[in-house]
Amino acid sequence: MSSAGQSNAVIHHEDDNVAIAVRPVESGEAVVVKAEERVKAAEDVDVGHKIALCSIASGGIVYRYGEPIVEATQAIGAGAWVHVHNTRPIPGDVEA
């Protein structure tokens, strides 16, 4: 569990709607970024994985580094793990 004020996730850009876990985060644990509680984790999230900071509608875009990275394939609740099981490449995106 996170100590009061101790960050367990990072956000790379102010427009991001996901945080990245810097250590494993347990279901029900506060997701803390720069000493500010953002959401409660809806499920266990491993280090390096994304956590939704707000609800993301099906078809909504996930932003990291202020850039669109994937599209939600289903509604993703605040605090949920964001990964390949609930996202896909943005239609029309071409990989370099």
How would you name each of these model-derived features?
Residues 2-96:
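N-terminal small-residue-enriched
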